Amino acid sequence: SPCEADVCVVQFNAGWNSGNDVEWHGKLKDCEIKYIDIAAYPDVASKYEIVVVPTIVVFNGKEVKRFQADISFAIAATKSEVQEVVDGILMDQF
């Protein structure tokens, strides 16, 4: 995972698509938040097989789930859907 913490949510996007940045990404709780510009880090994009931006990937050491944009380069997933995945990981740790 590209993160320091175990539980981490990464938004992969590109500068040219910044109008479709996922605004609520930084408001997720109980996880590390990371933003990676694939235009600046193409090697990271290929390592994680990012084919469309934005893509949000939830990691718990390794990839747990990904949410990908549709053909309009926007993500349909909601903050609560992604937070649910994070909460599920944390619940499993107890």
Question: Where do the protein language model's features map onto the residues?
Answer:
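Structural motif
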Residues: P2, A45-Y48
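Ordered hydrophobic segments in well-structured contexts
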Residues: V10, K34-I36, V57-V58, R66
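Structural micro-motif
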Residues: Y48-F59
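Non-catalytic, surface beta->alpha helical segment in thiol-disulfide oxidoreductase systems
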Residues: V58-F94
